């Protein structure tokens, strides 16, 4: 759909003629989207036909090592490069994938990206949703965000929205596809 209105903080004062900052926070200030990006990890798995919401998985911390292609894979804590935790380091035990989304579990997002699909497939879908490139909105200056996808920790973090940055406008565009059955 079209953007009909746009607003941001009340820092603009029409009575002040000398304006030092014309930054549009929605298009020019990238940020780590956090859990709002998990929707697209789940969407990639669903669209690939590999998602079973009732399938059980490990909802505890996701400790990881690497495979032969330097992608993150689940490992034991004492034989890992590091661990990703859920909020408050809570250990959920065995949960299904739907519950992983409901509770916004980082560990389940990592499992979906690294075991149900692959980090490369997830990245491909994020690009299709319009992340890491201009939205190309008429007349608005834009930042593209930053993609960190070099190390296993970067790839794992991308599944739950950390380590890379996007803009609010990119996120709105991507969610418009989710709410419109895939049409942006």
Residue ranges and their predicted role:
Residues 2-29, 40-184:
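Beta-lactam-recognizing serine transpeptidase/beta-lactamase-like catalytic domain environment
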Residues 30, 34-36:
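Structural signature of Gram-negative outer-membrane beta-barrels, strongest in the C-terminal barrel
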């Amino acid at each position: 759909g079209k953007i009909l209105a746009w607003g941001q903080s009340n820092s603009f004062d029409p009575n002040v003629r000398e304006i030092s900052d014309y930054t549009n926070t929605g298009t020019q200030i990238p940020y780590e989207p956090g859990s709002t990006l998990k929707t697209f990890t789940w969407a990639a798995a669903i669209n690939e036909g590999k998602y079973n919401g009732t399938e059980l998985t490990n909802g505890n911390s996701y400790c990881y090592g690497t495979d032969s292609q330097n992608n993150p894979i689940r490992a034991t804590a004492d034989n890992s490069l590091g661990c990703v935790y859920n909020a408050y380091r809570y250990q959920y035990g065995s949960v299904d994938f739907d519950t992983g989304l409901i509770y916004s579990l980082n560990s389940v997002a990592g499992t979906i990206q690294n075991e149900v699909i692959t980090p490369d497939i997830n990245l491909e879908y994020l690009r299709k949703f319009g992340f890491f490139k201009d939205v190309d909105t008429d007349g608005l200056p834009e930042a593209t965000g930053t993609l960190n996808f070099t190390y296993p920790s970067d790839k794992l973090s991308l599944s739950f929205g950390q380590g890379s940055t996007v803009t609010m406008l990119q996120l709105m565009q991507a969610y418009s596809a989710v709410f419109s059955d895939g049409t942006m």
